[in-house]
Curated annotation (Swiss-Prot):
Belongs to the LarC family. One of its GO terms (molecular function) is lyase activity. It comes from Desulfitobacterium hafniense (strain DSM 10664 / DCB-2). The keyword Acyltransferase does not apply. One of its GO terms (biological process) is protein maturation. This is Pyridinium-3,5-bisthiocarboxylic acid mononucleotide nickel insertion protein. InterPro entries: Ni_insertion. Involved in the biosynthesis of a nickel-pincer cofactor ((SCS)Ni(II) pincer complex). Binds Ni(2+), and functions in nickel delivery to pyridinium-3,5-bisthiocarboxylic acid mononucleotide (P2TMN), to form the mature cofactor. Is thus probably required for the activation of nickel-pincer cofactor-dependent enzymes. Pfam families: Ni_insertion (PF01969). The keyword Lyase applies.
Length: 402
């Protein structure tokens, strides 16, 4: 699996991340062509190679051709929605802007639809966010890790006056994320950078086991006492080499609630909201409570930094008045996604490995369902053929199967 590690020793901002992606191999001309799909003609984009404390990096500049344009979230949603961008880029970009809107709304004590974006609604923020999403997509990065984030200290000038560092919206977005400050004055982590990194990253800590393929440095505008750079390392997760054992270990939180008085029709919508918000798993079990009442035990597994968001959804969308939270340790087999061709069409197959052998071969259900609807053939028949084709593919590539 292609992964990236963001080393945020000098914070993170949208332009620094975009610069790091370009420095790590994202084709700048291709990026410009992709961004042209936004149909915004109010800016010019250019790159510059700079030195920060003797380290070369790429600085991305977005030059606005018009005055500072303030936009509402609905304006940004309309721009992205009608764009010619790929669906996955649209979806992730909208998710990031929605995260920003929610954070701003909470800070200002208003509804997300009433938020009037200032810096976030400017064209440079739109280009930074959509450009970063394009970069991860173009480089084939499937998983993102990050270090604890250096946020800086002091005050920063904003539309509402002087704000403490980290800015309130930044701190809200970084809830549950490890942050720190050293003797560096100024805003190092911006709301845009915080929104992007928390939308992509579920694990904040030291370097994962990764086979380094390329490294990029994105440069900030300020000159600091430390290199004002964001370092991006891209490569294959070493744990997920098909020929390696590499059982991965991780940590998460489990949230539990007992519910005996909720309309069961509401669970479908609840599951959808939890997964969209970043839940790792959601499931229910039948239980029996006091007074012999039939009920369900609703369980949600979530990354640490998503705790507040999950808690809010559970209290808003269920009838519970309390919940339990437990830290858990997870062990996961490395896996890879293969695409196989069948008489019905192409489909993805997830293959898990242990001790150098393929131990689980699972066709992706959504692909199987799509082919069943397309051809009218039985779903189970399509599932089995895809599974057999996958085994043949694995044999042909010399990976043993249990």
């Amino acid at each position: 699996m292609k992964a990236a590690y963001l080393d945020c020793f000098s914070g993170i901002s949208g332009d620094m991340l975009l610069g790091a992606l370009v420095d790590a191999g994202l084709d700048f001309n291709l990026l410009q062509r992709d961004l042209a799909g936004l149909d915004l003609d109010e800016y010019e984009l250019y790159e510059q190679k700079v030195l920060k404390q003797g380290i070369r990096g790429t600085q991305i500049h977005v030059h606005a051709l018009e005055g500072h344009v303030h936009r509402h979230l609905s304006d940004i949603q309309a721009i992205i929605g009608r764009s010619a961008l790929p669906p996955q880029v649209k979806e992730k970009s909208l998710e990031i802007f929605t995260r920003l809107g929610k954070a701003e709304a909470k800070i200002h004590g208003t509804d997300i639809e009433q938020i009037h974006f200032h810096e976030v609604g400017a064209v440079d923020a739109i280009v930074d966010i959509v450009g970063a999403v394009i970069g991860f997509w173009r480089l084939g990065i499937e998983k993102v890790f990050a270090s604890p984030i250096h946020v800086g200290k002091g005050f920063v000038k904003a539309a509402h006056g002087l704000l403490p560092v980290p800015a309130p919206a930044t701190l809200e977005l970084l809830t549950g994320v490890p942050i720190y400050a050293q003797d560096v004055e100024g805003e190092l982590a911006t709301p845009t950078g915080a929104a992007i990194v928390t939308a992509y990253c579920r694990e904040f800590g030291p370097f994962p086991k990764i086979r380094v393929e390329r490294v990029g440095y994105g440069a900030g505008v300020k000159d600091l006492t430390i290199p004002n750079l964001l370092r991006l390392t891209v490569g294959e997760l070493a744990d997920e080499d098909k020929g390696q054992e590499g059982i991965r270990e991780g940590e998460a939180l489990t949230l539990e609630v007992n519910i005996d008085d909720m309309n069961p029709e509401c669970y479908d919508y609840l599951f959808e909201k939890l997964f969209q918000a970043g839940a790792m798993d959601v499931y229910i079990q039948t239980i029996q409570m006091k007074k012999n009442r039939p009920a369900v035990l609703l369980t949600v597994q979530t990354p640490y930094h998503k705790l507040e968001e999950m808690r809010k959804i559970l209290f808003q969308e269920t009838t519970t008045i309390g919940l339990r939270v437990y830290p858990i340790k997870k062990y996961m087999l490395p896996y890879e996604l293969f695409t196989v061709e069948t008489n019905y069409g192409s489909a993805k197959v997830k293959v898990a490995f242990m001790e150098g052998r393929a131990c689980t071969v699972s066709p992706e259900y959504e692909d199987c369902r799509r082919l069943a609807r397309l051809t009218g053939e039985p779903l189970k028949q399509i599932y089995e053929e895809i599974k057999e084709k996958a085994k043949i593919l694995l044999y042909s590539t010399k990976y043993p199967i249990d």
